[in-house]
Amino acid sequence: MAEQKKQLLIVTGMSGAGKTVAIKALEDMGYFVVDNLPPELLGSFWELINNSSDFSKAAVVVDLRVKSFYKDLVDEIKSLEDSQNVQSTVLFLDASDDVLVSRYKETRRLPPLAHTGRLLDGIQEERAILSRTKNISNIIIDTSRLTTKELKAKLVDKFGDNQTRTFSIEVMSFGFKYGIPIDADIVMDVRFLPNPFYIPQLKPFTGLDRRVFDYVMSKKETKKFYAKFLDMLETAIPGYIAEGKEKLTIAIGCTGGQHRSVSIARQLAVDLAKKYPVDISHREISRYIGQ
């Protein structure tokens, strides 16, 4: 089977049109990204990428921060493709003048060519210089009416792969007495539920034991709470996915992480696994096994 040809993505466009957002989105998709690369170094960069097994997807950002070199960008792209048989894609990010003016006013920054301090003059001069590059671009995205989330979604749609779009959930039980997990996105306190700790026959065991699990899950208070909690999660999770989140960590806590949190986490993992990939872990369980 022939080795898959590496591709080079060249990102350019108007200052303020979303290149910073694009960098973060591409990195999240597994791209090796170099920002502010002078066009004359494109050939050297590609040689490095092409000869390395560490990088399968690479992107460079070139804009007018390197104005003295930018005029050579189109020629450098053509030279690179002719001499090294590179399959490159040029992405041009654009936005209307009025939107760019508004964005610069919000950030209190100036475009790179606003030498006199006049925003519009700098934007229009930049647009004129970039026109040749825009004409040879493979993909042009106008970000004028796009939110950050919408721009990320467009980039994932065009440059992502199936693996990029995966979403998974980790359900974790823990004990508050040992600290809240710092990487949890959602923390649910179930210390208000009936506690098997006070049942002598159940105290030595954990929520992994069927007797403890049945005790916790059969209680009226648990059933009422769990139904509402699951409904809340099923409502919220699509929103997390829409925001581009790849992994959601749900932490369920009771006092020691032995009985109630383990039982709830077990049931939650079963129910969420009907729709999503789910991993489950019990942070404190080793404290109680083998006692």
Swiss-Prot record:
It comes from Lactobacillus gasseri (strain ATCC 33323 / DSM 20243 / BCRC 14619 / CIP 102991 / JCM 1131 / KCTC 3163 / NCIMB 11718 / NCTC 13722 / AM63). One of its GO terms (molecular function) is ATP binding. PANTHER family: RNASE ADAPTER PROTEIN RAPZ. The keyword Chloroplast does not apply. Keywords: ATP-binding, GTP-binding, Nucleotide-binding. It holds the Pfam family RapZ-like_N. It comes from the Bacteria. This is Nucleotide-binding protein LGAS_1315. Belongs to the RapZ-like family. ATP binds at residues 13-20. Displays ATPase and GTPase activities. GTP binds at residues 63-66. InterPro entries: P-loop_NTPase, RapZ-like, RapZ-like_N, RapZ_C.
